[in-house]
Amino acid sequence: MVSVLLFEQHTRCQRSDTMAKSTYRTLRGSIFGNGNLKRTLLLDDGLINQGYRITGFFVWCGELLDGNCKATLSSQPKVAGSPQDASINTEIAWTSFVQEMAATSIRSSVQQDPVIDLDHVVNRDLYLSFNTNNIDLTWNYLIVMEARKLSDDEAILAIIREEAQNVGA
């Protein structure tokens, strides 16, 4: 139990140190419909040396109805109905949500832990794509980003990566 307390205290210290050095921003909203839904979230503020690292990505249903969706964040628009694909360099984060509101007493909502490419820094545009079941529902989203100052070299690499070019390791 002592080791757990020490770990929690150490984690808190690390978080407060990080918070002092970083600025966090959120994008949130909702989108209504079914099938393939898209939203363009423009992050291009004209500052080439400003980037954002996605640190959190959450979606959930706004109604108490059966529904499910897959959501993807990308630096380029996705083709409607295309699957989530980690081999595509422009895709940054993936998540899904399933809600079952059956007529029985058992009701459930499940949010998949988001899978986020923490090496990707968004420098210009960010696209949010939903692939949902065929029911008109309101889907909510919350995206947490860490604002980062980029050197000229880092900014150029971020733009190259946004255009789906592999910069290698």
Positions of predicted regions on the chain:
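Noncatalytic modules at the cell exterior or secretory-pathway interfaces
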Residues: 50-59, 118-134
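N-terminal low-complexity, charged segments
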Residues: 106, 118-121, 125, 145, ...
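Extracellular and analogous surface-interaction loops
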Residues: 39-51, 115-120
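Short, well-structured hydrophobic secondary-structure segments
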Residues: 46-94
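Intrinsically disordered, low-complexity segments
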Residues: 1-5
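C-terminal interaction-tip segments
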Residues: 6-7, 11-37, 46-49, 63, ...
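Extended, solvent-exposed segments with strong compositional bias
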Residues: 78-121
